[in-house]
A protein has these predicted regions:
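C-terminal motif of bacterial Sec signal peptides marking the signal peptidase cleavage site
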Residues: 19-22
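Sec-dependent N-terminal signal peptides
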Residues: 6-16
Length: 224
């Protein structure tokens, strides 16, 4: 259901490949709908959303233990923790900006002086550069509706409460469980995965995230 592995698998691909309730207005209850109808309602709701926040914790590949990202259209801002290093991130107009501690850059092979220089500022990875392709999996988080639409066959997994929100649970054949708001707009509230890439994603703040802006005065990596 949720192609998280494509995203986190790109995180440590190279020195700069860092990648790295539900609330809403009207809408009818999905509490009495079939699992397929619940999924369709969640896909429709996410397609109509202008922004949202997604956060996660778990044992992710690339050493990632947590992330918190705000998505506005195709733009993303937020942070993640990988191998103990907290990284700030902005993606805007296909440009990637990161701010990381010196330890992150020295682990990637930078000299102490170079790492200190990079850590003191935001670093811009220009669109079309050889480094930017390492961040292509970020699109997974700016297109939740497509991720949900790939769920395939789903079955009912009961009802409950997640983050104070009444939800309906549905489960795909791989064991991933999706919690969908059972009243109001059928926004996804949480995704839980099991197995080797086990993790939990919370989705919230639908249609209420401010516009993403570029950080000031970034250092720019070469375009090649």
């Amino acid at each position: 259901m949720w192609e998280r592995s494509r995203y986190v698998g790109a995180v440590a691909a190279s020195g700069f490949a860092i990648i790295a309730a539900a609330c809403g207005g009207g809408g009818s209850s999905v509490a009495s709908e079939t699992p397929a109808q619940v999924l369709a309602a969640a896909v429709s709701a996410t397609k109509g959303a202008t922004s949202y926040e997604i956060s996660g914790t778990g044992s992710f590949s690339g050493g990632i233990s947590s992330f918190d990202l705000k998505v506005v259209g195709t733009s993303i801002s937020g942070s993640f923790v990988t191998s103990g290093a907290a990284i700030q991130l902005v993606e805007l107009a296909d440009n990637i900006y990161i701010k990381a501690p010196a330890s992150f850059y020295t682990a990637a092979g930078a000299s102490s002086a170079g790492a200190a220089l990079l850590a003191a500022a935001w670093v811009e990875i220009p669109a079309g550069s050889s480094y930017s392709s390492d961040f292509s999996s970020l699109s997974n988080f700016s297109d939740v509706s497509s991720q949900l639409a790939d769920a395939g066959t789903v079955t009912s997994d009961g009802t409950g409460t997640v983050n104070g929100q009444s939800v309906v649970f549905i489960k795909d054949t791989g064991g991933t469980v999706l919690a969908v708001a059972s009243s109001g707009t059928a926004y996804p509230v949480q995704v839980k995965e099991t197995g080797t890439t086990a993790g939990t994603y919370d989705l919230s703040n639908w249609n209420s995230i401010p516009t993403v802006t570029a950080p000031p005065n970034p250092l720019q990596l070469p375009s090649s």
